[in-house]
């Protein structure tokens, strides 16, 4: 998909555990952030209805909206970007995955820190995160245990969180 504006530095990612607070979280984020709608837990019709509702809220705050799915699906649903292995925003956990993300406009490298999304997964930590990020040829968004405090510890300006904006 064509990029019309710069990528946001702050991103909110939807998840089953933060669904009830997403409206509040979208309102609390600084204007012009990014919102990645996943909601894999919902049946297709409910997922679409929830996307439409949250995309309206996100758009009212000037947030860029990405849909977890194919680029074609993202276009059909009215999202500005697609999130996923073959999307515009590509999650990456290793050098191999970074290399496979040839058509990405940005990478979400994770897990930067310990995260509730993947309990038991070994976090990269600041050094390994930066080593992976240095190999990327597109902008990198830190993911995994991210909030304002961990972003400062990582020393990385662009980050995404699931729980970070729920307070």
Predicted segments — roles?
Residues 1-24:
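N-terminal amphipathic alpha-helix/helix-capping segment at the start of soluble metabolic enzymes
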Residues 7, 30-34, 62, 104, ...:
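A general structural motif
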Residues 7-8, 33-40, 46-47:
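Short Lys/Arg-rich amphipathic alpha-helical segments
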Residues 12, 37, 82-87, 106-123, ...:
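Glycine-rich phosphate-binding active-site loops on the catalytic face of alpha/beta enzymes
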Residues 20-21, 40-60, 69-77, 82-100, ...:
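Active-site-adjacent beta->alpha loops and helix N-cap segments on the catalytic face
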Residues 25-38, 76-79:
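Catalytic domains of carbohydrate-active enzymes, especially glycoside hydrolases
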Residues 28, 75, 99-103, 152-155:
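Non-catalytic positions within long, well-ordered alpha-helices that form the structural scaffold/packing
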